[in-house]
Amino acid sequence: FAHRCSVDAAEKVNKISFQNNIPDWDAEGTSQPGEMILITQSLKELQLVMSDYVGIVRNDIRLQRASRRLDLLWEETEQLYQTSTLSPQLLELRNMITVGYLIVKGASFRKESRGLHYNTDYPGKSELVQNIVL
């Protein structure tokens, strides 16, 4: 499979037009984050939110609380993102919050308990197996 993918990619790469006039990053108006602790603390908070509210056992109230806390984390991180020079830690945090949103949203759509994910509001397994596409 990997060989077929590489052959296909090699055939198509010359048909792609690449944009060469992309401007360099402009860091004007941004500064180094004065306190990396803001990023570190937000990461710890994200881990706690996901573990406490969106773990193996969950319910609709926990998922709603997780969503609200992710909203706050996103706002704080976005403000830092807009005013700071980019760092791998800041970008990772933004990406992890986005993944957290997707997990919470997918869990909110599922109105059943299946596999290792048990929702106390919906303890039974649905007859219909559904894939959640976000």
Question: Which ranges hold each PLM region?
Answer:
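Glycine- and aromatic-enriched mobile tails/lids
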Residues: F1-L134
